[in-house]
Amino acid sequence: MSKVLDEVLQANAAYAANFGEKGKLSMPPARRFAVLTCMDARLQPSRFAGLAEGDAHVIRNAGGRASDDAIRSLVISYKLLGTREWFVIHHTDCGMETFTDDVMADLLANSLETAAIDEKGWHDTGKGPGSTDGWFIKWLTIKNQADSVLEDVRRIRNHALVPASIPVYGYIYDVKSGRLIEVTEATKAGRAAA
């Protein structure tokens, strides 16, 4: 058994021992909102948004981007589970700003091993085999945080399956201060219809 697996199972045993009434939480989120944010381990939506278990849906992916799958989850969150407000929250110092689609595709074509970054950029540390399948994926990398938040809010707002009644707010989480910074233009673009 790996050390990580052992630690996770021990933590779960302690958590389950004190689970209490959480098994009675209803499936729809109590506070009726959803957050789309990055998978970065420094971001803890339960902390920065004041969430308890059962409060909100949290959808995470690399960059917190409005991918087809993220929008699928948001639509299910609304249509079947009743969320009424959505947040798109990207963050400062995001790894998605450190590469382009071409860089990622090249890295994968060379090797499937973990890459490394230094002052010269990303490079492979292992040897092949790689795969050219990375050329067929849109990696949704980020050039500018405010622009990417605006782009994602607009993509959600204009999606045919997203009701005009749902407000979509755009924010950037500052990893140095813990503060949420509104991207005013994004929140404006995500306004619900009156």
How should each PLM-predicted stretch be described?
Residues 12, 35, 59, 88, ...:
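Divalent metal-coordination and catalytic microenvironments
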Residues 48, 52, 61, 93, ...:
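Short glycine/serine/threonine-biased micro-segments
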Residues 56, 71-74, 85-86, 101, ...:
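Generic internal hydrophobic packing segments that stabilize the cores of diverse globular domains
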Residues 2-29, 64-66, 76-81, 96-194:
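Divalent-metal-activated hydrolytic enzyme cores
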Residues 39-41, 92-96:
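Gly/Ser/Thr-rich loops at beta-strand to alpha-helix junctions
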Residues 18-72:
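Conserved beta-strand-loop surface patch within small alpha/beta domains used
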